[in-house]
């Protein structure tokens, strides 16, 4: 389900209904087993487990769809170290499932404020796994017992479900299976008014 940020709270309220949850669960189960749903759920946290990447890779390869032409990734220090000496035309692999976003602001925020690398991967691709869409369905299909309620929930709104959906909708995450990337250009660019200059690696998937 494609969700707009403005619709999150209303959908969260609807998702408190057992009937709504069951209808969404049937929809989700047409695509993913319970185990696969569990793997995707764990990806809302940092994906540091090698076994998780193995299972995740198998899942997303079965569900690749047409993606936006351009995706972005603000890279970690380990990835920056991996590619720092590479030149245009060279190939590299992170040996893991990589998350990208359609949101340039999100990618810049991760690179600038979380990883402190000021380095962006800009990927041109025609297919990827729409994690944001699929995990939104899973969140909406989940029973109320999966989420914490807070004392501020005076209207019965499940704030943790809402918070999770807000995060997912803002990040607009897409995933690329484990594989190789080819560097097509390297540049210094000011990508967003809220940030300074970034080192940008334009890349493409090597089939």
UniProtKB/Swiss-Prot annotation:
InterPro entries on file: ModB-like
Consequence of changing residue 130 to A: No effect on enzymatic activity in vitro
Effect recorded for residue 176 to A: Complete loss of enzymatic activity in vitro
Record bears the keyword Glycosyltransferase: yes
Keyword Zinc tagged: no
Documented EC number(s): 2.-.-.-, 2.4.2.31
Alphabetically ordered keywords of this record: Glycosyltransferase, Transferase, Virion
Localization (cell): Virion
Top-tier EC class: transferase
Catalyzed chemical reaction(s): L-arginyl-[protein] + NAD(+) = N(omega)-(ADP-D-ribosyl)-L-arginyl-[protein] + nicotinamide + H(+)
Protein name: NAD--protein ADP-ribosyltransferase modB
Organism per entry: Enterobacteria phage T4 (Bacteriophage T4)
Gene (name only): modB
